């Protein structure tokens, strides 16, 4: 049996991933499909945590630019991530995977508060944990949430599951047919090149805590499992210097 490359991962999903072809809102069949992909990996014995963005329901930055108070806009976005987390948790439960939602803002009626020790215990017991409501403070992205929670739970890697994007390029491949895809980068290279994989805070956190980052196409069935079992798909960002350097 092939040994997995990673035994504990944090999967970062964009909110748009839950919207399907609609692009906005939540498409339940799409969520159920993603849940089945995650279940297949979970059934291989991998410990899994999730962070889901809220962009399918709310965008804080344009609301702020339109005149809304930035702090209030960000808190609204955090609530959007909770909605997405609850929907995904329900889909995973129906797929037969014991799942817990933990929020950085207290809302005991719908989710557990984020407690690191409890999250670790859930993972050790084979439960999936979904971290929602960001870090509980405005001005921090769900990318930063992913890097912070991955460090706290000592994840081996953050899997950046993208919609239709199969890795990191030196230019936008949709606009430049000659754009070059990177198979591997270091965190420092990402920061120096200004590649917009995550925001700089999240990239620095990942680098400082030696957490691999894998960017891959979520829309191709089986890709989550392929990444975890070490197949070369997408782009892997590590703290180590590439052999080609």
Swiss-Prot record:
It is found in: Cytoplasm. Pathway: Pyrimidine metabolism; CTP biosynthesis via de novo pathway; UDP from UMP (UMPK route): step 1/1. ATP binds at residues 12-15, 55, 59, 163, 169, 172. It comes from the Bacteria. The keyword Kinase applies. UMP binds at residues 54, 74, 135-142. Keywords: Allosteric enzyme, ATP-binding, Cytoplasm, Kinase, Nucleotide-binding, Pyrimidine biosynthesis, Transferase. It catalyses: UMP + ATP = UDP + ADP. Residues 20-25 are annotated as: Involved in allosteric activation by GTP. The keyword Transferase applies. Allosterically activated by GTP. Inhibited by UTP. GO terms for molecular function: ATP binding; UMP kinase activity. It is an enzyme of class 2 (transferase). Pfam families: AA_kinase. InterPro entries: AceGlu_kinase-like_sf (IPR036393), Asp/Glu/Uridylate_kinase (IPR001048), Uridylate_kinase (IPR011817), Uridylate_kinase_bac (IPR015963). Homohexamer. PANTHER family: URIDYLATE KINASE, URIDYLATE KINASE PUMPKIN, CHLOROPLASTIC. Belongs to the UMP kinase family. This is Uridylate kinase. It comes from Streptococcus mutans serotype c (strain ATCC 700610 / UA159).
């Amino acid at each position: 049996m092939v040994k997995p490359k990673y035994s504990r991962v944090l999967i970062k999903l964009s909110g748009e991933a839950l919207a399907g072809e609609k692009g906005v809102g939540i498409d339940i069949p799409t969520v159920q499909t993603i849940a089945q992909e995650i279940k297949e990996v979970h059934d291989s014995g991998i410990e899994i945590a999730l962070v889901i963005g809220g962009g399918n329901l709310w965008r804080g930055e344009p609301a702020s630019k339109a005149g809304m108070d930035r702090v209030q806009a960000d808190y609204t976005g955090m609530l959007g991530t909770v909605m997405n987390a609850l929907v995904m948790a329900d889909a995973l439960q129906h797929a037969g995977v014991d799942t817990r939602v933990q929020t950085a803002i207290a809302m005991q009626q719908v989710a557990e508060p984020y407690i690191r020790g409890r999250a670790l215990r859930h993972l050790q017991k084979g439960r999936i944990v979904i971290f929602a409501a960001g870090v509980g403070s405005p001005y921090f992205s769900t990318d930063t949430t992913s890097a912070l929670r991955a460090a706290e739970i000592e994840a081996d890697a953050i899997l950046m599951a993208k919609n239709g994007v199969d890795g990191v390029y030196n230019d936008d491949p949709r606009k430049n047919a000659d754009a070059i895809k990177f198979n591997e980068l270091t965190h420092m290279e990402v920061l120096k090149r200004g590649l917009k994989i995550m925001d700089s805070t999240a990239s620095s956190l990942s680098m400082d805590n030696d957490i691999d980052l894998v960017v891959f196409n979520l829309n191709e069935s089986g890709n989550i499992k392929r990444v975890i079992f070490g197949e070369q798909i997408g782009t892997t960002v590590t703290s180590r210097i590439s052999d080609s350097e």
